[in-house]
């Protein structure tokens, strides 16, 4: 399970390890325009915890306990590795924290690759570091969370803020193309829009798991996308995986499960691959393939899919349509004036043409 809190770690792993061809979808100006990572900082606090026997140990020892869970990545002391691959590192006595600064160039990437070998291995290290932030949760709170059966369990889980995190990324600067003339700027990742964050998150996950025997489950990936990205999402996803698997084509066929309400995404899927979920009169959820209902989704218009799958036949907003319909029913107004008012007030649509026709045919 990978959530939005790990977006920086996922993206960083991809930008450090993937070849330029695999990163084309991110670099494309029409997508995010991310050309690479410029620099970033990592901070690790030297906290002390108590184990179940009451003995004290630092999180250095915690890594030793979990060493086997990350396939031997931690073959060397982590802090020695980070010192070796960073541009500069130091220890802050006041807050008991280590800082590692990285000015990223090709040598930086080669250094990461020599220690961590693959993007997924590098990410596993970052993921484990993120886990340490949870150790601030008391045993009493852990027990309450584990035994909770309510719908507000997530709200019980308080994560420390940036100042108290054991592991934290700082000054995460990306190189972004700002216009079609090639202008570039260094931007913090937090300066990107919600849609860009979601796009980066989805594509980076797919790149990260491209060589893994995995089922990718994407829950409404288009939520914050603009219309252009929604209409091109499947094409972009397909192109991203194809480029990433170049020279290793047997990995290209990935099983991806997408939940969506977007007619654009459905229009790019064959009917035998589209499963429609509906509730019957008793409230039971029924599942049928679009092909079983003779709904040809592939290449279908969004209005057709809206009507056939989502039961929404409206092609324009409900408020505008009701106002348009109300105007067409006015009988005490000059016909030509009414035609002019409808033409001026409303944008172009099939509904508008039908209303104009209805008014024009009035006796």
Stretches found by the model and what they are:
Residues 161-315:
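Switch/communication elements of ASCE P-loop NTPase nucleotide-binding domains
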Residues 308, 312-363:
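C-terminal alpha-helical "lid" subdomain
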Residues 7-200, 204-215, 245-248, 360-361:
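Extended helical coiled-coil dimerization/tether regions that scaffold
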């Amino acid at each position: 399970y990978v959530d939005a809190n790990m977006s920086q770690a996922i993206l960083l792993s991809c930008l450090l390890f993937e070849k330029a061809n695999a990163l084309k979808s991110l670099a494309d100006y029409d997508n995010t325009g991310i050309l690479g990572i410029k620099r970033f900082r990592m901070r690790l606090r030297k906290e002390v915890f108590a184990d179940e026997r009451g003995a004290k140990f630092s999180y250095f020892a915690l890594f030793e306990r979990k060493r086997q869970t990350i396939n031997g990545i931690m073959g060397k002391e982590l802090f020695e590795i980070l010192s070796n691959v960073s541009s500069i590192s130091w220890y802050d006595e006041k807050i008991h924290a280590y800082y590692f600064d990285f000015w990223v160039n090709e040598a930086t990437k080669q250094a990461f690759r020599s220690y961590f070998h693959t993007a997924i291995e590098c990410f596993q290290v970052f993921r484990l570091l993120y886990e340490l932030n949870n150790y601030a949760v008391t045993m009493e709170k852990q027990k309450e969370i584990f035994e909770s059966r309510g719908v507000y369990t997530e709200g019980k889980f308080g994560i420390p803020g940036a100042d108290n995190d054991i592991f934290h990324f700082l000054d995460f600067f990306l190189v972004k193309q700002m216009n079609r003339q090639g202008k570039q700027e260094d931007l913090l990742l937090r300066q990107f829009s919600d849609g860009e964050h979601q796009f980066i998150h989805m594509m980076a996950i797919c790149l990260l798991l491209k060589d893994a025997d995995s089922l990718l489950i994407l829950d409404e990936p288009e939520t914050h996308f603009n219309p252009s990205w929604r209409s091109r999402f499947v094409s972009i996803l397909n192109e991203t995986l194809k480029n990433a698997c170049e020279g290793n084509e047997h990995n290209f066929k990935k099983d991806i499960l997408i939940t969506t309400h977007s007619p654009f995404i459905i229009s790019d899927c064959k009917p035998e691959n589209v499963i429609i979920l509906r509730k019957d009169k008793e409230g039971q959820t029924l599942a049928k393939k679009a092909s079983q209902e003779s709904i040809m989704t592939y290449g279908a218009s969004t209005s057709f899919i809206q009507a056939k799958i989502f039961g929404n036949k409206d092609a324009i907003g409900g408020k505008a349509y009701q106002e348009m319909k109300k105007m067409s029913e006015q009988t005490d107004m000059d016909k030509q004036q009414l035609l002019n008012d409808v033409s001026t007030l409303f944008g172009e649509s099939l509904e508008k043409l039908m209303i104009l026709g209805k008014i024009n045919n009035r006796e």
